[in-house]
Structure formats: C-alpha cells, structure tokens
Amino acid sequence: MIGTSFIDSTLVDVTFHSSLMRYSNFANCKFQHISFVKADCLQASFHYLDVKDLSILESCLDETEFLESSLNQVDLSDSSISGIVTDLKSLKGAKVSFEQAASLAQILGVTIV
C-alpha cells in the first residue's frame, strides 16, 4: 500500500496490521474506530482528519505529518516518531513516552539542557 491516496475517504472499523503504508496520504479523511498495529507509515500525511477512536500500536511514524488532526488520547508511546511533523492543536492530549516528550519539546520551542 505504499503511496496510497486515501484523500477525502471515510474509513470505519479498519485495522492496518503489519501494513506497509509509507508515503500514504490521508488528507481530509474521516476516521472512526481505526487502528494502526505494527504499521510502517514512514513519511505518511495525516492532514485535516475528523477522528473518532484512533489507536496506534508499535508503528513507525517517522517523518510523518499530523496537521490539524487530533491525536487526543492516542497513545504513541510504543511507536517510533522520529522527525514527526505536527502542530500544537494535533499534539494536544497525545500520550507519549518520556523520551518522546523530550524530542517533541522542540515543537513547543523548549530547549532542554
């Protein structure tokens, strides 16, 4: 599924398990009961999502973009998020590990010394 365009799609009750989702585009999608489990979403784009019940487990979100897409209550702590691109609105309420929080601090303009 590399580079698949899901633009303007509505996805309901879908689990992407061990899926190769690199470079996929989920712009303007509606997500309801969606799970990414051990999915490789390197450089995927999630822009302007309408999210109801999203879970992400043990997935690669490296260099992925989450813009105007709520990650509230989404646990990212066991996923790789190196180089993630996001905005404060999307990030608010996301659950991350201590190490992830340190790297995400740059988005907030915080320098850790």
Predicted segments with their positions:
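Tandem repeat scaffolds
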Residues: M1-V113
